[in-house]
Amino acid sequence: MAISKEKKNEIIKQYARHDGDTGSVEVQVAVLTWEINHLNEHIKQHKKDHATYRGLMKKIGHRRNLLAYLRRTDVNRYRDLISSLGLRR
C-alpha cells in the first residue's frame, strides 16, 4: 500500500525546512524511510514477494545516495536527520 496523502503531509510538515518545502533532502529521506519501514513489514509477512523486495532495494539505494549527498554538503544537517529518524551510521 502506498503512503497516504495525510501521512505524507504529516512527514513533510515535520521535516520541511520552510513552508511549501517538499523537495529538500530531509523531506525526501524522511518519506523514503517511512516507505522502507512499511515495505519491511510487508516483506516479513510475504517472504516470496520478490518484486516488492526489488522495489525495497531501489528505495534503500536512493535513500543511501541522498544521505551521502547530504553528508558531503552539510554534515550538521546530516547528523540531525539521522538522529531524528533513528538511522544507523
Swiss-Prot record:
Per the record, the GO terms for biological process are: translation
Pfam families tied to this protein: Ribosomal_S15
Superkingdom assignment: Bacteria
Q: Which UniProt keywords apply?
A: Ribonucleoprotein, Ribosomal protein, RNA-binding, rRNA-binding
Q: Which Gene Ontology cellular component terms are annotated?
A: cytosolic small ribosomal subunit
* UniProt GO molecular function: rRNA binding; structural constituent of ribosome
Supply the SUPFAM superfamilies for this chain: S15/NS1 RNA-binding domain
Quaternary form? Part of the 30S ribosomal subunit. Forms a bridge to the 50S subunit in the 70S ribosome, contacting the 23S rRNA.
Give the family this protein belongs to, as stated in its UniProt record: Belongs to the universal ribosomal protein uS15 family.
Per its UniProt record, what NCBIfam families does this chain match? S15_bact
Q: What does this protein do?
A: One of the primary rRNA binding proteins, it binds directly to 16S rRNA where it helps nucleate assembly of the platform of the 30S subunit by binding and bridging several RNA helices of the 16S rRNA.
User: In its UniProt entry, what is this protein called?
Assistant: Small ribosomal subunit protein uS15
Where does this protein come from, organism-wise?
Streptococcus mutans serotype c (strain ATCC 700610 / UA159)
